[in-house]
Amino acid sequence: MGIHSLLYCERLFYLEEVEGILVADDRVYAGRTLHEELEPNEDSSGRIESFHYTSEKLEVSGKVDRIQKRDGDWIPYEHKRGRARIGTNGPEAWESDQCQVTVYALLLEEATGRNISEGKIRYHGSKDLVKIEIDEELRSKALKTIDRAKGLSTSTNRPPVAQNENLCKNCSLAPVCLPEETRVITENEYEPIRLFPEKREKTTLHVFGHDSRIKKSDNVLLVEKVTETGEKSKSEKIPIQEIESVNIHGNCQISSQMIKFLVSEEIPVHWFSGGGNYIGGININPSGVQRRIRQFKALTKETIRLNLAKKLVSAKCESQLRYLLRATRGKDETRNETESYLATIRSGLKNIESADSPSQLLGIEGSSARAYFSGLPALLKNSDPFLVPNGRSKRPPKDPFNATLSFLYSLLYKSVRQAIIAVGLDPSFGFYHTPRSSAEPLVLDLMELFRVSLCDMTLIGSINRKSWIDEDFEITKNKVWLSESGRKKATQLYETRLDDTWKHPVVNYSLSYYRMIELEVRLLEKEWSGEANIFAQARLR
C-alpha cells in the first residue's frame, strides 16, 4: 500500500509504489527478519496472523501483521523494528505509523462491518506497546493520504527530493533518488554527503572457450573445463549471491535451465563472439514504464537532444585533449609532435557551443577523433612497433592495437548497456547517435564518456608496460583479432580498470568507474526530470 513511505517522503513512495523500484538494504532485511521470526502465541483463539484485504471502496490493499479480538472488538496490530517516539506522557507512535494503522482499521471495518476504535503498535527497538485511538482526526488524515497516493500513482513525473535532508541518510533508495546530487544543483555551496555506493559489491564472471561448461550445484555456480574425451580437467566455484553478471565468450556451453535460473536470480547474461564482438544479452529490465515515458517525451524534443549532444561531444573531445596533454607533459619532443593534433581538438571544442545540428557536432567529433588517434602513436615511442597503430581501423581492425581497442569497446558497450537497463531506460532510444546498425543508440551515446578513461588509457598503459606477446593475437591478410589468451588479458585489464576509483569534480566524492557508469545514466535521467546540469560534467584531470 505504501502509506508509511508516502508520509515519510512522497518521492520514496513514487519510486517504490509507482515505478516499482525496491532496494533491500540492512534495515529492510532486518525488518523482514523481524516479521519472519515473530512466532504466534500458542493460544491463537480470537487472533489472526497476517491479515490481507483489498478494498474496492478505498481502492487500496493492505496486509496487517496481526488482528486480535478483545471484548468482541477487532484490534489491528503492527510490528516495527525501530523505537517509539518519546512524548510528554511516555512512548508515542510516530505520525506515519499512526496513519498506517488507521488505514488498516478502515480496511478491517470494511471487511468485518464493525467499527474499529483502536490499534496497537509494538516497537521492538524500545520494547514499547503503543495504543492508537482511531478518532475522526486520524480517519480524515488517512483518507487524505490515500487520495494523495492515488494522485501520485497516475502521474509520470517524480515528486521533488525531500526538503529534510536527514530523511535521505537512512533511505534505501538514496542511490536511485540521488538527493544529494540534486541539492548540489539547487543549493549554493552545498557540500554533499555520499549516499551513492563507491564500488561494485559482486564479481563479474567471464567464461572463455568451447571447452567450458557452466553448471549449478546447490547455490554455487560451477565453471568446468572439459577435455576432448569428455573428462573434467578442472572447475571454478563461485557462490551465486556473489555474481554480478555472467559473460560468455565464444561457444561455452550453458543450458536453458541454467539461463532460466540466472534470470530468476536477476543476474544478467551476456554473449560475445569468438572474435570479441558483443552479440547480445539478457538483462533484468525493472518495472516502471514511467521512466521510459519520460525518456521518450524528452528525447523527441530537438532542443533537448541537441543540448545533451553538445554536453556529450564536449566531454569526449575534452577528455581526448586532456589525455594527450597529460601523456606528453614534460616531454618536449613528444609534445611538439602532437601540437598540430592538439590544436585541431582545441579548435573543435571552441565550435561545439555554436553548433546548431547533430550533423555539425558529428563533423567536429570526427575531426577531433582523427587528430586524437593520429597523436596516439607518439605515446608509444618505446614500444614494440608491432603494437603501434597507424590511425584508427575497425570492421575489421587492421593491427593488434585496433583489434584490442575494439574488444575493449565491446566490453564497455556491455557495461553501459547493462547500466542503462538496470536504471530502467530504453537503450535503443538515444539523443546523438542514429540507429544505423544493431548497436543501440543510447548505449553508443553514453560510451563516449568512458572510451578514453576506460579503454584508450588502459590499452596504452598496458602496451608501455610490455604486457602483450605475439601469441595474444591472430593475424590474417585482411584482419587482426585477439586470441583467447589475448581476450582474457584484455578482459582482466578492463575489469581492473573498472575498480579504479576517481573523484567526481561536481559531486565531490570518489567512486569506482564501475559505479561512475551507473551514476552518469542516473544523472542523464535527471536532465529531463527538472534536475539538470550534472550529466557529462566529469573530466580527466
Curated annotation (Swiss-Prot):
Record GO biological process: CRISPR-cas system; defense response to virus; maintenance of CRISPR repeat elements
Annotated catalysed reactions: exonucleolytic cleavage in the 5'- to 3'-direction to yield nucleoside 3'-phosphates
GO MF term set: 4 iron, 4 sulfur cluster binding; DNA binding; DNA endonuclease activity; endonuclease activity; exonuclease activity; metal ion binding
Subunit description: Homodimer, forms a heterotetramer with a Cas2 homodimer.
InterPro entries on file: Cas1 (IPR050646), CRISPR-assoc_Cas1 (IPR002729), CRISPR-assoc_Cas1_C (IPR042206), CRISPR-assoc_Cas1_MYXAN (IPR023844), CRISPR-assoc_Cas1_N (IPR042211), CRISPR-assoc_prot_Cas4 (IPR013343), Dna2/Cas4_DUF83 (IPR022765), PDDEXK-like_dom_sf (IPR011604)
Residues engaged in binding Mn(2+) 1: D65, E78
Family to which the UniProt record says this protein belongs: In the N-terminal section; belongs to the CRISPR-associated exonuclease Cas4 family.
Residues that hold [4Fe-4S] cluster according to the record: C9, C168, C171, C177
Cofactor: record remark: Binds 1 [4Fe-4S] cluster per subunit.
Keyword Disulfide bond tagged: no
Entry keyword annotation includes Manganese: yes
Domain of life: Bacteria
EC number: 3.1.-.-, 3.1.12.1
Spans annotated as CRISPR-associated exonuclease Cas4: 1-179
NCBIfam families linked: cas1, cas1_MYXAN, cas4
Organism: Leptospira interrogans serogroup Icterohaemorrhagiae serovar Lai (strain 56601)
HAMAP family, sorted: Cas1 (MF_01470)
Region (CRISPR-associated endonuclease Cas1): 204-541
List of residues binding Mn(2+) 2: E365, H433, E448
Function: CRISPR (clustered regularly interspaced short palindromic repeat), is an adaptive immune system that provides protection against mobile genetic elements (viruses, transposable elements and conjugative plasmids). CRISPR clusters contain spacers, sequences complementary to antecedent mobile elements, and target invading nucleic acids. CRISPR clusters are transcribed and processed into CRISPR RNA (crRNA). The Cas4 region acts as a ssDNA exonuclease, while the Cas1 region acts as a dsDNA endonuclease. Involved in the integration of spacer DNA into the CRISPR cassette.
Protein name as it appears in the record: CRISPR-associated exonuclease Cas4/endonuclease Cas1 fusion
Obligatory cofactor(s): [4Fe-4S] cluster; Mg(2+); Mn(2+)
Keyword terms of this UniProt record: 4Fe-4S, Antiviral defense, DNA-binding, Endonuclease, Exonuclease, Hydrolase, Iron, Iron-sulfur, Magnesium, Manganese, Metal-binding, Nuclease
